[in-house]
Amino acid sequence: MDILEAIILGIIQGLTEFLPVSSSGHLELAKAILGDTSVPEESLTFTVVLHFATALSTIVIFRKEILQIFKGLFQFKWNDEFQFSLKIIISMLPAVIVGLLFEEELESFFGGKILLVGCMLLLTALLLLLADKAKNTKKEVSFWNAALIGVSQAIAMLPGISRSGATISTSVLLGVDRTRAAKFSFLMVVPLIFGKIGKDLLSGGLSFQSSEIMPITAGFIAAFLAGLVACKWMISLVKKSKLSYFSIYCAIVGSIAIGYALLN
C-alpha cells in the first residue's frame, strides 16, 4: 500500500464513519463490481489504526461531553451526568450481545450479498427521509429511547444499513432533539470502537513492516482530519433537517445495487 492509497482509504473511513451512507455496504458493492480479488482486504493493523483515528476525532469534538460521562460514572449520584452515562451503557448492550453471540451469523451476511445490501440501503434511505420530515423533536434521550436506539445500532451491523443513519433517525423519530440525537449517536459508538480495537489486539495478528510506517501514519492523519470535518458537518446537517440529501443518495445506490444483483 502506498501513501496515496492510504490517504484515500483514510479519508473514506473518516467520512463514512459519520455520514449516513453505510461504509460496509459500499465495500460490499465495490467487491462485487470489481471482483473480490480486485479489492483486497485492508490489513488488520491498518483497519485498527483507521478506527482509532475516527474514534479519536470523536473524542476531540465531544471532549466535554465525554469528560462528563466519566465524571458521572464515578460520582454514583443520581444526577444528569450519571443518568447520561447509564444511557450510553444501555445503548451499547444490544450491539455487544449481537456481536458476541451471533458473530458467525453476521459474517454470513457479508461477501457478495448485493441484493441484501441494496435493500438495506433503501431501508436506510427511508429512515433518513422519515427523520428529515419528523416534527416535535425537542425531547431528551430517555432510558427507553437509549434502549431502542441501541437496538437500531445492532440492526445496523447488517451491510447496507448506516449506523449513524439508523441511530440518528431512530432518535429523531422518537422525538429526541436533533442535535442531541446526533451527539448521542456519535458518543454511543466510541466505547464499541475501542472494544473492537481491544478485541483485535488481544486476538493477535497486528503487525507491520518498517516500510508501512509512512502509509499507516498518512492514513491515520487523513482519517482523523476527515472525521473531524464529517462529524461537525453531520451535526449541522441533522440540525438543519438536511438528511434527505443522503436519503436520495442511498436510494440511488440501493436501486443500482438491486438492479446489478438481479441482472447478474
Predicted regions: what they are:
Residues 1-264:
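Multi-pass membrane proteins that catalyze or facilitate reactions on polyprenyl-/lipid-phosphate substrates
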